Amino acid sequence: MSKKYDCIFLDRDGTINIDPGYISKLQDFKFFDFAVAALDMLKTLTNNFIIISNQSGVARGLILEQDLIKINEYIFEEFSKNNLGLLDIYYCFDHPDNPSSRRKPGVDMFVEASEKYRLDLSNCLMIGDTKWDILPAKILGMESMLVLSGEGEKHKNSFEEQGKPDYIFKNLLLGAIELIK
C-alpha cells in the first residue's frame, strides 16, 4: 500500500485524541496513546499534516476561542517536539444548524489549505472518524481512511456506495501500520 502523499489531512477529536464530547480546556485534551507512534509512521508517506476540525463548541458557547487557541498551541508543540510536520490547523465554529461550506462535510477548509500550501488534493489522504470527514475527501478526489475510534464505529455502515472510505481501520495506529507496508 505504501504511497507518498502531498499531505495527510487529519480530523482532530476521535482521530488523534480522545473525544469525551466538547473539549473546553487544555487539560481535557488527551492524545490517544498511539497517536504519536502512528503519526511517526505516517510521516514516512509525507511529513505534511494539516488538521481540519469542526469546533461548533465555540458557537454553542461551550468553549472560548482563547481556550481553543491554547489547545491548538499545545498540538503544534507536540507535533514539533516529535518532528512531525504540522503545517496548519483549520477549524470552523459554525453551528450544525447553520453551517457554511467551511464546516465539514463542506470542502472550503480543504480548498483553502490546498491553495495556501499548493497541494494536489488528488494526491492527499484524509483520515477521520465520521462520514463528515470522509465525504469532503470523496468530493475532492482524495483518498480517505475511516478510523473506528471516536465516532467511527457508529458511522462505518452509513456510507453510500460511491462515498465509502478507501480504508477502514480500528484506529490510527493500525491504519498507519497497513499504509506503510
Where are each of the predicted segments found?
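Short secondary-structure boundary segments
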Residues: N54-Q55, L148-E151, L172
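Active-site neighborhood of HAD-like aspartate-dependent phosphohydrolases
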Residues: M1-I50
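A short acidic, helix-capping loop that chelates divalent metal ions and anchors anionic groups
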Residues: P20, K25, G57-L62, H95-S100, ...
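Structural recognition of alpha->loop->beta junctions
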Residues: N72-Y91, N157-I180
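Conserved Lys-Pro-Asp/Glu-containing loop-to-beta segment of HAD-superfamily phosphomonoesterases
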Residues: S101-I134
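Substrate-recognition element of Asp-dependent hydrolases with the DxDx(T/V) motif
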Residues: A35, L39-N72, G85-N98, A137
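Acidic, Mg2+-coordinating phosphoryl-transfer loop and its flanking beta/alpha structural elements
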Residues: M126-Y167
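Alpha-helix N-cap and loop-to-helix initiation/capping positions
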Residues: L26-K30, I63-K70, K104-P105
